[in-house]
Amino acid sequence: MKEPDDQDTDGEKSVTSKSDGKKSLRSSKSESRSPVQEDNTFLEDDTDETFTKGEGSYLEEDSDEERLEGSLSSFQYGDLQSTTVPQQTPAPAVEEAEEEVKKKISESFFYDYMELASMPFVTLDSNIPLDLLTLVHSFGYDCRKRANLQLLDDSIAIYIAGNQLIFLNLKTKEQIYLRSSSGEGIGVIGVHPHKTYFTVAEKGSFPDIIIYEYPSLRPYRVLRDGTEKGYAYVDFNYSGNLLASVGSNPDYTLTIWNWKEEQPILRTKAFSQEVFKVTFNPDKEEQLTTSGSGHIKFWEMAFTFTGLKLQGSLGRFGKTITTDIEGYMELPDGKVLSGSEWGNMLLWEGGLIKVELCRGTSKSCHNGPINQIMLYEGEVITVGSDGYVRIWDFETIDTADVIDETGLLEIEPINELQVDKNVNLFSMIKMNETGNNFWLAQDANGAIWKLDLSFSNITQDPECLFSFHSGAIEAVAVSPLTYLMATTALDCSVRIYDFASKTPLAQMKFKQGGTALVWVPRMVNFTGAQIIVGFEDGVVRILELYDPKGLTIFAGRKKILDADIQLKQVFKPHTACVTALAYERDGEILATGSKDQTVFFFEVERDYKPIGYINTPGPVCQLMWSPMSHPESTLLIICENGYILEAPLPTIKQEEDDHDVVSYEIKDMCIKCFHFSSVKSKILRLIEIEKRERQRELKEKIREERRNKLAAEMGEDGEKEFQEEEEEKEEEEEEEEPLPEIFIPSTPSPILCGFYSEPGKFWVSLGGYDSGFLYHCEFPPCDESSDFKEQKDEPIDVRYLADTEDNPIQTITFNINKVMMFCGMKNGAIRVYVLNQNDPSLTSLVDYWHFNMHDNNYGCIKSIANSFDDRFLVTAGADGNIFVFNIFSEFMLRKDMKAKVPSPRFGIETEPIPEDIEDPKAYSIENARRKREHDKLMKEVGEIKARKREQIKALRSEFCNLLEMNEKLPKHMQFKRTDFDVDSQIRAEMHRKTAFKIQQVEKELAWEKEKHELGLMKLKNRFRDPLESDTIVVHAILSDHKISSYRLVQPSKYSKFKRASQSERKPSKLDRFEKEGPGRKDSQRDAGGSVTIQEESIIEKGKKFRPKTLSEIIVENQIEKTRKLILKAERAQLKIQQRKKEWEELYKSKPGDDYEDPKDLQAIKEAQVYMGDFNLKTAPDYKIPEHMRINAAKKEEELGHLDSLVHGNKRHMNKCILSLRDLKVAVVEEIQCLVQELKNIQSTLHISKHIPIPKIPQIHPEEVPEKRFQYDEETLLNFKQQQMKSKDEKSPGVEQTGSGGPVGGFLKLSSRKDGDLTTRDSISRSSKASTFSLDIPKCLEFEKAEPTDVELEIMKRDEIKHVYMQQYLVNRIKELVVTFDAELRLLRHQKLKLDTQMKLSDLHHVTLFQEILLLKNFEKQENILQERVNSLDKEEQYMQWKINETLKEMEEKKNEITKLQEQEKALYAGFQAAIGENNKFANFLMKVLKKKIKRVKKKEVEGDADEDEESEESSEEESSLESDEDESESEDEVFDDSICPTNCDVALFELALHLREKRLDIEEALVEEKKIVDNLKKEYDTLSKKVKIVATNLNAAEEALEAYQREKQQRLNELLVVIPLKLHQIEYVVFGEIPSDLSGTLVFSNHALRRLQERIHELQEENSKQQKLNKEWRERRKQLIREKREMTKTIHKMEETVRQLMISKFGRVVNLEALQTLSVNTTLEELKIRKLRKELANAKEMKMWEEKIAQMRWELMMKTKEHTRKLYQMNDLCIEKKKLDSRLNTLQNQQGNAFQGPREADVVAREEVTELIQLQAERISALKEEIALLRRKGSLILPPIQSPREKEIQPADL
């Protein structure tokens, strides 16, 4: 065994962790999480390599809301590690948080493999070495595990085997092992895209993902807390910096990792059901896809406002049935192609199924699920469970779309490869072998294949590199002599291995799977060469192993293997699967157990003879004979349902006693039974009682010590204190919890295994509830009267097994000296107990060694065995793995160890191989005997029935004799037929029963009838309906000539669709570019401009519908008037410019004196190159013209055209032959009529004058093949009779005769019937002609007298007429026959010519097909080259267009510069003219004009006219303020241009300033235009360089394409083409004779030869034509020179006339262009319009303010009125107040005299008066405030103020 970082381990070291990887129950998470030990020097040396310790589980901290949210916040890029702060300077929490620093993992950091790898668990102080068992080799392969085959390089493959990762060298077949870290299994593995790392995703509680470096195999990174129980799939992205993982049940967590930093980026729940796979999109790494049970989901990593999220979109199946998706593939454009359970491909787009892809005739793409889909080199590869690898066209799939309501699209694969029969491909990986297309395939049926997918003529056949068992290993057995082992499984195979040399030797396949296996002991077969195997159909086979090298060697024999297996004997003792096999200790008896609840015994001799069987109360799971130490030989039978039986040796009967026995059942055997009753609850109860008793004793001891201590210290006081404390404790103590209840499971726990301990005693291991213990049981005495099912027995002793409550022992075996007990556990672990010698009670069952090897979930150990010398241990698990271990020994194993295969027995090659039992429904031994007895009984019953039938037959003959005697009697003495009926009702009942039976038979046969009708219809649809016309053979009448039609099949819809699709080819990218052209952008810009114009027009239309005011109408009229004037001037200027442009173009188009037409030059060049040259396709420098280049599509179109042409010709010929057949039928009918007439005529003539009647032609069956499918009842009856006659005949000749009988008979019958019909027709047709001949004999019948002379004359005349008619009819018949034969010969001649053409067409078809195959091989590379040429051509055209655009823009800019320069000159000229000649300030004004000043750049401000005006004014002010004075030409002169000099014209000064601004504008525009021109020149230079580079690349690409075309043409030239030639067509002769070798000849077509001959005449005609044209053009040139002279004179005259008219009208010569373009002053007109608008706006505003003043006056008047009303109210209130004051004074004076009442009334009155005074005071103050408000102007008038008292009084008053 090889492991990375393998180190010596100390055997005496105590290990406290189990193999599941938990280190002392993970007590220290910081230790388990920290990849390195805490070491100060480590931190000092590598500060980057720091990790966080004490980190908790990430999934435990997640809340349920975060999981349902669908995504989690991303982690920080590194772990946070809090730094400690000294206690002297405590800092606040904020500062502590800021001191946490992100730490990154160093790229050079690695973990220690020995710290990560799980180790065996050994009990403390047991002195058991850790390397008690050492893995030597693995012979198994978990082939049904997804993605369990990966490649690290060309020779190293890795796969999972339980808790090991195996590195398999494909060349040397060596294995290296890597242990899991958790010890609970490995979930899945993955490989980095660069093959530098691989990942191992484990299983267990919160398992890790460990990433190892390759090839060092050192642990590089550990990813934690990605799932709860295990990983289902992992995948790296294309760049390899991210890793995606998905968990298994129960959480199915999808996690995206930044694996180099060991941090999860995103996490969410993938789905609620099982997820099979997750992958990144290789083209868009932010997209992922997951698939699984009944779903597919599309994910995207998207940035949201809360951060990076995983957003998933579930695929909706719609009308398609929901399916599990195993394989899928992401397409480059985002679509996804997935498989399905029924084998079709589903194309997904936008989360929906776009189309379902199937094969032609609605066949599925694969027969079964598609397990993998890949995209490789532009082709789609699908891997199916049917064992096929199919290649599909990517373009067809990518552009697929629905064409009908079914949603299906039929496509066909390009290539396909069937690996082998019974192959279930699960996955494939590309092998990185340069120059080869080899793949490594995982076969779920137990193999690793090497596939060659190159699909060429040198493609290698699929090679099976390794073969394994598929599925669970059911049994394993080891040879008693050597290092050989045998295994069997449900994959129907038995395999032999040499585990010493680590080599598989032989295998043998069967129809059923093996379930039990035992190596025959030496006492039965001394050489140890026999194996006995039990199968699931109840068959037991004895196989013999031998070394074929010891056989006699024959010539021509295949490769001799190291071992071979041969079937020796086979028998079937059971009807269900055989579960156990056991040989008696002396080897005399074989016992077999089965699930059919029987145990069968065989006597072991030369052949195994059945003894008998016994019934068991349950399915048998194990058989074991007692060892030699027991006094008697007994069989221990263990049943699954809790029964254990002990059977003695059966009695062997003699053959003569056995002959008359009806059954093999043994009924008199004394069998002991033990029915296990659950005692685990009792054991747990006893344990709890003992635990409480120990606790009670401990408390009592502590109490006694306490009392003694207090008594010694304090005496009697201490005793009292102790009693008080005890009383308090007794009060505080609560009642004890109840003991565990006794529980017995309703379903008995299954018994897994057992073994003898002593005679009558045994140990058993149970599963289910009773697991966790090993039970020692004893059989009760044998009692035949008792019922097993009512029996309940308990074990006598138990042994506790640590950590087996949920993990029971599945199988047990011992070494030779019984000191080690090897246990195979349910979770795939191996446990070894070290025992004392002679310890049947297992008292030393304490110390053990425990190690997880097989898969913990489904890797239950099915069988475990040790070698004959206890040096090796073999385990076989349900996970398909077979491990071989070296048991700890002082002796080292030799590397050259090898097992010895037994030599073959003498005469083994001559022995006949026994007939195997392959039928699973075959009778067992017991059933065969019972069947034999039943057949014997049925034979006796048949003999009795036969005797009864003879008696009935005699009675029937006697009754028939009585009937005959009755018929011989006279009628009056005869009995009536009814008198013989004993009972009339019997006959009626018989008729009723007969009718009922007929009805019943019709009902019973209704299904058969419908079945046969459907079968006939399907046969017609399959074989008859596709035929367009069958073969018809028309025979000539007089000769043996015949002509046959073509058997035509209707053209398929696929071929029609294919031709249509080929004819409608897509345009190339270059064509599309040429169609679109470079002006597309301009058109888009124009379109955009039109849109804006359209929007503006819509706005203008909206304005038109509004009512216009008078001011708007005035302004619009003024604007329209100005616009018309400007438009007129612009039109004139445009016309002048257009005329100038036309003249410029005309002068530019004038060719130079040395100009030559490029077309002429090209034609001359081609003529010089190709003159007198006829290019051959075989020439090495042959250049294929563009129109003659071919590809596969063109060839397929040509092939389709050829097929349609051939089909049309054949169809036309078939129509002609069918017409000829109809002509023959018509001729035969007419001849039949004529023959009938001839017979009628000859009946009146004398026989001497008869002419031989011509034979009527017959219609052959070949001429009417359609009548073969017409039948009637008579035909069917004949067919039935012939079938009955030929029922027992087996010869092929007889079968052919019988099958052809009904057809031939039917055709004769049909022809006879047709003949009768035609005869009747002929009689009816010739009835009129033959009436006269029929009347004469009738007259002769009545008149016997001699005829008279007249009558004789009439008879003579009639005779002459009839003789003539006879000859005429005969000639007519001959004419018809000869004419028909002539027509047939003519048509036959045409048919022969057509046959020749059809043969040539077939040859041409073969040639075209060969060319298509060749062209398809070239098509891929040619498309790549053509695409490159197209792209470069497109790029060159685009750049050329860009250059042209740049040149055009440069020309425009140069024109703009010229115009600006002309404007500047015009400006100076105009200013000079305005100054005049003798102006003394001319120099000053010119300096002002030419002065250079700095200006602020004007900003474009959008707004109305006022804002524009303000901006212009401000810019002028700023420019005048910020302008600096420059030095003039004279440095001494300094002048101020801001002040106009005295005596200088102010208008000229202002004009100078104004023109200076214009000059500056022009200069700025010139600078900008020159900059643009410079930039355009640079761009032009850059583009020119790029064009040259692109042109160079284009030329190189075209040359490469041309070279590839030549290579393709050369390969096409190598194809052999058949051309039939006649001798006169061969003109290649040597010395007057045709040479024998014609390889150097050239086949030249007549068409090409005629074309060359015609070309001579064409060139002669062209020459004469060109001479004639030359002469005409010379004459034309002379004429043009004369016209030019005349036109020059006319121009001079017209110029003089124009000059004179200008002088007469203007007084001088003026510039007409300036006159025509004279326009209005736009600035002045704009100012006028703005002024008008401003006046109108001011008037409108004045009107608005006047209306507002009137409104305010009205409001002032209303306020004044209100104020006056308030003053009147205040006056009234003052008067009232005065009155009240006076009245109050009067009441106060009369207070003492007025009232003499009680004191209480005075108090109330006083209070009321006080309240009234307060109220009035409040009212007065309120009125004062209101008066003050009313006196102010513009104050807010409030409603009258009321006091609170008034508010209370008013409702009362109301």
Curated annotation (Swiss-Prot):
Span list, region Disordered: 1-98, 708-743, 1057-1093, 1282-1322, 1500-1538
InterPro entries: Beta-prop_EML_1st, WD40/YVTN_repeat-like_dom_sf, WD40_repeat_CS, WD40_repeat_dom_sf, WD40_rpt
Any one GO BP annotation for this protein: microtubule cytoskeleton organization
Any GO MF annotation of the entry: peptidase activity
A Pfam family hit: Beta-prop_EML
Annotated Acidic residues bias: 58-67, 714-739, 1503-1536
Modified residues (Phosphoserine): 1083
Location(s) in or outside the cell: Cell projection, Cilium, Flagellum; Cytoplasm, Cytoskeleton, Flagellum axoneme
Biased composition (Basic and acidic residues): 1-32, 1061-1085, 1311-1322
Domain of life, source organism: Eukaryota
A cellular-component GO term for this protein: motile cilium
PANTHER family per UniProt: CILIA- AND FLAGELLA-ASSOCIATED PROTEIN 43-RELATED, CILIA- AND FLAGELLA-ASSOCIATED PROTEIN 44
Functional note: Flagellar protein involved in sperm flagellum axoneme organization and function.
Protein name: Cilia- and flagella-associated protein 44
Organism: Homo sapiens
